[in-house]
Amino acid sequence: MQLRTGAASVVRTGLGLTQSRCAVQSLTAVPLERRIRQSKAFYHNTKKNDSAWAAAVSVAGNIVNNAVTKAIKGTDGLPTIDPLRLVAGEMKFLTGNIRKLLGSGHPSLDRAAKYYTQAEGKHVRPLIVLLMSRATALCPKAPQRQQSTLQASAAIDTSISPLNILSDFNPSDATPVSIPADTDILPSQRRLAEITELIHTASLLHDDVIDHSESRRGAPSANLEFGNKMAVLAGDFLLGRASVALARLRHAEVVELLATVIANLVEGEFMQLKNTARDEKNPKWSEETLTYYLQKTYLKTASLISKSCRASALLGGADAATVDAAYLYGKNLGLAFQLVDDMLDYTRSEKELGKPAGADLELGLATAPLLFAWKTMPELGPLVGRKFEKEGDAARARELVLQSNGIEQTRALAQDYAEKAIEAISGFPDSEAKDGLIEMAVKTLKRNK
């Protein structure tokens, strides 16, 4: 199978991700480890030369050699792969299945809970889960995981407790879902994709209340349509139904992973309440500021993608190396995705985004473009400290960011994380699904909303 320019070029030998490594083409670009030598900078404070900031500066200096950049250019004229086409059969049933999982005997709750499923969302997270499920189907299996894999797929619509207990005084319950035939994606992996979207949608409902959002996906936000109380309760209901579906997978490690995601979302939201670890009134720029931001970004965005990818490989019975590689792909892709999202807040209009543009500054949030700009523009410090509350603060901060190289630095760091995502799955056997995962990393950098 022929890959697009840049896709094959990031695949390298000697990384030790799996034992079933195909013959691959070596990188002609500057080796990744020479540009960014650590992948855990956002978990711990690090030495100056091994920090997230040092990595970002190094990445920006070598961006012309970046393999993902070459993939985006597509100089060989090959058509790009459409990841959605590869799992179209499963995605076709996604929204309908989710709505079946959300049935409630309370009409108002039913409408609020299903509100965001009516709009046409990107469904990026379930798409990634399904692609990962198909890509890891060809990878080595762990014999000790086969029994739990069979259990997880055998009874995803079967309750563990008696139904009369679960549905007492509630005339409506989750109903069996539609399953496409003749596919190498297991029923448990399809259900995982639906659970992932449920958790993500619940986080949108809660975030829109916290952020006082007025629009979502080009329509009035749920909090505007139903009020804050109903929106919060609807989000809680989605998490409840996701938890039930998760329990019925009957796979303890997967339950632990996705339950941790829900906790991570809350932890990340608490971290976002302040822009720096010390929350000073007149903070000074430091490398730890970017570390704090990346940790928050992992918790709020990358945790769901990374742990869902890992869970997908576990449900397929993959060996430990494949499971770890799936996690690394999701972690790095999730970080790249959010970095691009934060960049678009400065470069796109509300009409293009389908949600308010410039919202981060209005909410008092200092994201990557501003943090990079702050390094050379210390006058941003007092604005960050008071969370852009004074009249004109947000406009001034935006002006300074656009005058700096903050957006370019953010783009460079996002490209590096995308390359690391591609590198993580380089040991997977060649397949259309693997190519689709590579294309998802490329599309993450090219998206404009």
UniProtKB/Swiss-Prot annotation:
Its cofactor is Mg(2+). Isopentenyl diphosphate binds at residues 122, 125, 200, 217. InterPro entries: Isoprenoid_synthase_dom_sf, Polyprenyl_synt, Polyprenyl_synt_CS. An all-trans-polyprenyl diphosphate binds at residues 216, 300-301, 338, 355. Mg(2+) 1 binds at residues 207, 211. One of its GO terms (cellular component) is mitochondrion. Binds 2 Mg(2+) ions per subunit. Its EC number is 2.5.1.-. It is found in: Mitochondrion. Mg(2+) 2 binds at residues 207, 211. Keywords: Isoprene biosynthesis, Magnesium, Metal-binding, Mitochondrion, Transferase, Transit peptide. Pathway: Cofactor biosynthesis; ubiquinone biosynthesis. SUPFAM superfamilies: Terpenoid synthases. GO terms for molecular function: metal ion binding; prenyltransferase activity. It comes from the Eukaryota. Belongs to the FPP/GGPP synthase family. Assembly of polyisoprenoid side chains. The polyprenyl synthase of coenzyme Q biosynthesis catalyzes the formation from isopentenyl diphosphate of all trans-polyprenyl pyrophosphates generally ranging in length of between 6 and 10 isoprene units depending on the species. This is Probable hexaprenyl pyrophosphate synthase, mitochondrial. It comes from Neurospora crassa (strain ATCC 24698 / 74-OR23-1A / CBS 708.71 / DSM 1257 / FGSC 987). The lineage of its organism: Eukaryota, Fungi, Dikarya, Ascomycota, Pezizomycotina.
